[in-house]
């Protein structure tokens, strides 16, 4: 997911699915959402994100890893729910 957006290889449909998954993540776990926003969209490193959020780098790395996996699962579930065009 992360690589695709930065390379411009993500489809419009996937961007919509990602946006919906991010909204769900924000409601579910705001800290993970913030880690994703800083790492992915702001381009901060683990260390920079940790400093910005007053967390340890290990915590940020764990939250980042979990959030990416969760987002991919959510997007896949949403993709399966969509009717075929």
Predicted region positions:
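Short acidic/histidine-centered micro-motifs embedded in hydrophobic/aromatic stretches
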Residues: 1, 38-39
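DNA-recognition helix of helix-turn-helix
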Residues: 53-77
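Amphipathic alpha-helical segment used for protein-protein interaction
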Residues: 5-37, 44
């Amino acid at each position: 997911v992360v690589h695709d957006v930065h390379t411009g290889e993500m489809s419009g449909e996937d961007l919509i699915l990602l946006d919906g998954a991010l909204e769900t993540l924000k409601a579910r776990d705001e800290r993970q959402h913030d880690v994703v926003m800083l790492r992915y969209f702001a381009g901060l490193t683990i260390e920079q994100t940790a400093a910005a959020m007053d967390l340890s780098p290990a915590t940020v790395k764990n939250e980042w890893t979990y959030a990416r996996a969760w987002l991919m699962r959510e997007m896949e579930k949403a993709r399966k729910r969509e009717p075929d065009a």
